[in-house]
Amino acid sequence: FLQPYTDVNWLDPGCAAEVMCQPDNSFTTEYTNNNSDFQALRNAAAARHLDVNIVPATERQKKRLIADMDSTIITSESLDDLAEMAGIGDKVAAITQRSMSGEIDFESALLERVAMLRGQSNRLVSNLIAATELTPGAIVLVQTMRANGAKCYLISGGFDFMTRPVAALCGFHDHHANHMHVNDGKIL
């Protein structure tokens, strides 16, 4: 039903590929949501932890990548990791979970979590940066987007002490996040 007319073009061998197709129908969202063949393809892909997306050829090359940092470009939640290093991980993770489930708003959760870190040594920050792991494929994603002319931005509801080195390592054009104040080697 998709009628591929190209071989697989591997963007990242074994991880990401594109196949150019000439669909036999207009692939609107409504059509794909109601098409049993497409749903079977999506289900088979999901069973193998793969995503399938249909994008018009005229819109396939993107001009911008805006990526969240925590649990997207890096493998974990940086503020939770910082709290873990400070010995208050469970308390901060519980607030994070309440925020993610909509029980409390983001700003309140952020202020509450940062207040719990007040007075901690800023050495925790350098330890956190050293321990942070990139999600496999993050660098390839940014390099591929840049090679194709896209502007790439890293964003976070966390802090710029993390987005700065992660953005530099991956090759993002710029980064945007909150700023954590430090004075006399202590988190304020």
Which sequence ranges carry the predicted segments?
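Non-catalytic pre-domain segments flanking phosphatase-related domains
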Residues: 1-67
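Alpha-helical substrate-recognition element adjacent to the catalytic core
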Residues: 4, 10-20, 57-60, 70-185
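Glycine-rich tight-turn/loop motif centered on a GG-T
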Residues: 188
